Amino acid sequence: MKRQILLFAAALSLSASCLCTGEVSADYETSLSRAASSRQLAEQETMGLLWMRTSAEYRALCYQAYNTALSSLDRAMKETSSRHKPFAIILDCDETVLDNTRAMGTYASRGKGYWDGWWWHDRVHEGKSAAMPGALDFLKQVSARGVEIFYVSNRYKPDNLDVTIDNLKTLGFPSADRNHVLLFTKNSDKMPRFAKIEKSHQVLLYLGDNAGDFPLGIKGKSLAERQHIIDTSAKDFGTRFIVLPNPAYGSWVSAMDTHYMKLPVEKRNEVNRKYLTK
């Protein structure tokens, strides 16, 4: 009888041990799953940049944007009968005219999912940005048509103006001077700079990679408001407004969360999950 009791106790102990091992195993699998999910979401922050760096499709879309822009410009020039002001186009610089993806890729490969303001400030101050696919040929043709070109960028004027002008000149871009390169000082909203140009010029085209590059009053708006504004201006895209693709960064990020770029990875992942499943 004593021997049977001992065997029963041993069986209970073994059963409990297996059960605990199962619980630990389940917890471990859950932890691995969560860690993998976090890594996947964090890595997806660089997938858009990787697409810009490597894909033929990205280059094709850039060429398509500039081909469309030139056709739209020619049509607008023909359809404008009265000309009280000189013709002009307005376009953004970074990821519209100037390509910074190599520098961003180097930064991201060091484990930095997003590039902060100080890094961006220092990087653009080096003046080593490349030309975007199709940008130089397009702007040379615009200039040959007698249309003025204005570069309206949110690079920081006090520090980055001269180096930006030099970078554009080195690459051969026309109208690279202080009268045509308008950076920001106190206000990153481009609307006041657009209005200033529109007083003296008839602006036929706007080009950019961000919704704020167009005269839509979109700065500071929520995701839903941004989408509504775009929807109500649908007829202007592909005609008066030409958008270049940029899945790597932009005001759409801060529209998800004002402090997104400063959040730790897990907090960013929470924001990502929220909108991926919304």
Tell me what each language-model feature is.
Residues 1-4:
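Positively charged n-region of N-terminal signal peptides that target proteins for export
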Residues 9-17:
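Bacterial N-terminal signal peptides
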Residues 16-91, 257-278:
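Non-catalytic pre-domain segments flanking phosphatase-related domains
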Residues 51-62, 121-129, 150-156, 182-184:
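Second-shell loop/turn segments in exported
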Residues 56, 161-278:
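C-terminal cap/substrate-recognition subdomain and adjoining C-terminal extension
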Residues 79-86, 97-129:
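Active-site neighborhood of HAD-like aspartate-dependent phosphohydrolases
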Residues 88-91, 98-99, 148-153, 182, ...:
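Structural recognition of the beta-strand scaffold that forms the well-ordered cores
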Residues 95, 135-168:
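Substrate-recognition element of Asp-dependent hydrolases with the DxDx(T/V) motif
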